[in-house]
Amino acid sequence: MASKGLWDCLFTLGFLFALPLSSQSQIFKLPPVLYQSGGRSARSLAVADVNKDGIPDVIVANGSTVGSGGVGVLFGIGGGTFKSAQTYPVLFEGADAVAVADLNGDGWPDLVVGSNGGVSDPTPSLSVLLNKGDGTFKAAIGYSAGFDIRSVAIADVNGDGKPDVIALDQADRHFIHSAVAVLLGNGDGTFDDAVTYELLGGTNALSLATADLNGDGKPDLVLTDADDKGNGIIEVLLNEGDGRFPTRVKYLSGVFGSSVTLGDVNGNGKPDAIVASAAGSVAILSGNGNGTFSKAVLYPTGLAGNLTSVAIGDLNGDGTPDLVISGPLEFRPQNGKVAVLINNGGGTFKAPIIYGTGGLNAYSVAVANLNRDLKPDLVVADECDGYITSCPAGGGVAVLLGVPARTTTTLMTSGSPSLHGQQVTFTATIIAAYGPIPNGIRVTFYNNGTRIGTAKTMNGAAMFTTTALAVGTHTIRASFPSSPFFKASSATVSQVVN
């Protein structure tokens, strides 16, 4: 666990340059807390309660070199803090990707880890680690899924109720094509031999995501790639309904994509593709609900260079998904960063907010509620650089806990003085440090300290109307409540009744 003192000083210095916002508008607590991942270079992570104690745990794939530490498991101990990593070896060289699901139906989360396999064929480029039933894991079982696994996902692609594994192989052993491998699950933690689908580009595919893109109830696939002209694309593989993906369709993404995720960012009920690029921008391709996508729209992230990961989550409590992007991939001290792009509400995004993560490179980011306060937090696989004594060079996990936004309430009257029995409307307007105030939050109104009623927010304001004020001078107060996403605030106005 993190120590204090010098660490805090070093982090604070880094964040003064990395974060162009006041402490009043912070979405996440600074500085982040940094843990060692148990390996040489944390590359990918997932969050799940692997020991079923009700507290989220972090699982880290620890890099692509021999002796890298395989996969590390950091048990959560409450409050968004974690124990030291327990590590488990994988079957070949290193671990570049990890996914978590119950693979054998025993109710306990298991692990699938993708590795840089090697040049022999077949190679155990996938390692399956079954949970022992206490959050620790059995020895890895190997499966061949290609040469260089960069991304893995778990989904029931053939509709038999058993989880299957999808793995993205960046390059075959001849370095000619990227491919996606599908391993159908048997329901007992074992899998059939991989069925592979060659992609349309060369050896440029880096990331995959899965979701039902056309509403048929079957998971489809989206992958980042580049075509033969070097244009950034996403490739869409629609499920035939039985777990086969024979057709590949490409869409220009406007960027060479390093990471892709799927989610409904514009609120139309259809999955959209969000692509982080190698050039510092993020592309949004709106889904049409039939497996096709609209033209990409690009947004700057404020991160110069190769972005590494993108995740989505509602960070400000307005009911719309926001974006978190990690990067850039540059080997400089305390270079790791994440960019937060708040959704405007219709799938467009505000200017980025930048947070430093304290390490050399931020390789992967996940959004999860780590301390069970109902507000999303961030976990970043962040290679350490040796500048922090409690995190020497090697793999690190940076934790940024979410904090409620400061709010400001103003209160106005429809007219003062008023006559006895006359209708008077009091309007409380609430502004948050980041993002809009959601509709439906109940604001309480008081007259000289006595509660007189409530009104729900609508478009950032709550209006309360009364005719019951007695003759005299009244101090009316509107109180906006605290919540996981917002701090409380209040305001008063004087009302004279003749």
Residue ranges and their predicted role:
Residues Y363-P404:
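Blade-level signature of beta-propeller repeat domains, shared across WD40, Kelch, NHL, RCC1
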Residues G54-P56, G107-P109, G161-P163, G217-P219, ...:
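Glycine-aliphatic tripeptides that mark coil-to-beta-strand junctions in extracellular
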Residues V58-N62, L111-S115, V165-D169, L221-D225, ...:
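Hydrophobic beta-strand segments that make up the repeating blades of beta-propeller
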Residues G63-S68, N116-D121, Q170-F175, A226-N231, ...:
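Short glycine/acidic-enriched loop and turn motifs that connect beta-strands
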